A protein has these predicted regions:
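C-terminal beta-sandwich interaction modules and adjacent acidic
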Residues: 1-402
Length: 402
C-alpha cells in the first residue's frame, strides 16, 4: 500500500451511526514521506451502493451480459498536509487530526453475493499520499468500517432492563400419524417473543418455544417404558428443532432485478447446536386424558419448553430504490413419518437500537485515548462477511484513476 513508515492512520474500529462526525488522526513521518516523494496527503470519506446483475442468455453461444450500477452515498475530501504550504522546522513526525461528517439518512452497511448478482453498501476512509511524477503511484491507507442508521432506543432499554411488556405468540397445530393408516395424533408448536414492532440488533430478546403432543387413542397401560416411544414424542433437545434466520429482498440494476434469499447462521441460542447450554429445557409431566366412552382408552399429553435469548447482529432492515431486505425467523419441527412437519415463519424487523452521538464539543486530542461519547458505548458489531472488509465488490476510487 505504501511506505511502511510514512503514514499511520489512527481511527477507532467500531460501528458508526449515520449523522455522527468521524474523528481520528494520522501520524506523518516527514522524512519517510520525503524519501517516498509524497508532496500532499489527502483524506477521503466514501460511501456507495454497488450492484451487479449478470444475465445468462437462453441460446447456446450467446454468452452473458453484466449490468453494474454505483450510487454515491457520501463523498468528502480534505487536505491534511501540503508540502508547499507546510511551516518550517517541523518535527520528524507530525500529527494531522481530521473530522469527517457522516450524512444523516445513510443506509446500513450490507453485503450480499450470489453467482449472478451482488450488492454492497460500504463505507471507508482512505488516506492518500500524492506522489509527484507520472510513474509514481499514490500511496493509500484505507480502513473499511460499518455504518447503521439511528434506531429505536425504547426497545433497547426495555430489553436491557428485562422485558416486562406483552408477548406475541405464533402457533401452529396439525394432525399427524406415523404410518399411512390409523388414527391421527396431534402436535402443537408455539413460539413466543416480546410484542415489539422492531428488535434492536445485537441486543438479546427473550423467547419461549413450546411443543405439545397428544397421542392417538391408546390404552392407559401403554406406557413408554413398556411399549417404546409413543408417537409423537416431544423433542428431547432444542437441537431437534430447526431454526433459521432468512434474509429476503430484492436488488435492482436499471431495468433488471433479482431476488435476495439467503440463510443466516444463528449463534449462541436456538439454531446453534454448540449453544444448547444457553437454552433452558423443561418437560411436562405426562398426563392421561380418558376419552368419553373410549372403552378404557384415552390420549397421553406431553410437552417440552425451551427458553432463552436470541441475538440478531445483522444489518438493520432497510429499503432503498436500489436494494431492500427484510428478515424471517423460520421455526420447524419434523416428526417421524411422511410430511409430519410443523412450521411457521416469524417476521422480524431489525433496527440498530442506538442513537447518533452528539457533535464534538472540544477539539480532537490525538494524545488522549478515544472515549465513546454515549454512556451505552458504541453500537454492537454487525455480522458482515469477510468480503465486505476486504473490499470485494466495492467500487474504490483508484479504479477510476483518482
Amino acid at each position: 500500500m505504501g511506505h511502511p513508515d510514512a503514514i499511520t492512520l489512527h481511527f477507532p474500529e467500531f460501528v458508526r451511526v449515520a449523522g455522527e462526525v468521524l474523528q481520528g488522526h494520522i501520524d506523518l513521518d516527514l522524512g519517510a514521506a520525503g524519501e517516498d516523494k509524497i508532496d500532499e496527503v489527502h483524506i477521503k470519506l466514501r460511501g456507495s451502493i454497488v450492484t451487479r446483475i449478470t444475465e445468462y442468455e437462453n441460446k447456446p453461444g450467446e454468452g452473458t451480459q453484466t449490468h453494474y450500477k454505483t450510487e454515491t452515498l457520501v463523498r468528502v475530501d480534505q487536505v491534511l498536509w501540503d508540502q508547499k504550504n507546510a511551516p518550517p522546522n517541523l518535527p520528524q513526525v507530525i500529527q494531522c487530526p481530521f473530522q469527517l461528517p457522516l450524512p444523516t439518512g445513510l443506509p446500513p452497511s450490507f453485503h450480499f453475493s450470489h453467482h449472478n448478482r451482488a450488492v454492497t453498501i460500504s463505507y471507508a476512509i482512505e488516506v492518500v499520499g500524492h506522489r509527484h511524477g507520472i510513474l509514481h503511484a499514490n500511496r493509500r491507507v484505507r480502513k473499511v468500517f460499518p455504518v447503521v442508521p439511528p434506531g429505536d432506543l425504547a426497545a433497547t432499554a426495555a430489553l436491557s432492563q428485562g422485558w416486562r411488556g406483552p408477548w406475541r405468540p405464533y402457533r401452529v397445530q396439525d394432525k399427524i400419524r406415523h404410518g399411512i393408516f390409523g388414527d391421527h395424533s396431534e402436535a402443537t408448536m408455539e413460539f413466543v417473543v416480546p410484542e415489539l414492532p422492531t428488535f434492536p440488533m445485537g441486543v438479546g430478546f427473550p423467547f419461549a418455544l413450546h411443543i405439545w403432543t397428544k397421542t392417538k387413542p391408546v390404552h392407559q397401560e401403554d406406557l413408554e417404558s413398556k411399549h417404546g416411544k409413543l408417537f409423537p414424542a416431544p423433542p428431547e433437545s432444542a437441537s431437534e428443532v430447526e431454526v433459521k434466520l432468512k434474509r429476503r429482498g430484492r436488488l435492482h440494476v436499471y431495468f433488471q432485478s433479482e431476488d435476495i434469499d439467503e440463510n443466516i447462521q444463528l449463534r449462541g441460542s436456538l439454531g446453534d447446536s454448540a449453544a444448547l447450554a444457553n437454552i433452558r429445557t423443561t418437560f411436562d409431566q405426562p398426563t392421561f386424558t380418558p376419552l368419553p366412552d373410549g372403552h378404557n382408552k384415552g390420549v397421553w399429553n406431553r410437552g417440552v419448553h425451551f427458553e432463552g435469548f436470541l441475538t440478531l447482529p445483522e444489518a438493520p432492515t432497510y429499503s432503498t430504490k436500489t436494494v431492500e431486505w427484510h428478515y424471517i425467523l423460520e421455526v420447524k419441527m419434523d416428526f417421524p413419518g411422511l410430511g409430519n412437519i410443523l412450521k411457521f415463519e416469524v417476521p422480524i424487523h431489525i433496527n440498530s437500537g442506538v442513537a447518533c452521538p452528539p457533535l464534538p464539543q472540544a477539539p480532537y486530542q490525538y494524545n488522549v485515548p478515544y472515549t465513546y461519547p454515549l454512556p451505552g458505548g458504541p453500537p454492537p458489531m454487525m455480522n458482515l462477511p469477510p468480503s465486505y472488509w476486504s473490499g470485494e465488490h466495492h467500487n474504490w476510487d483508484e479504479v477510476n484513476g483518482e
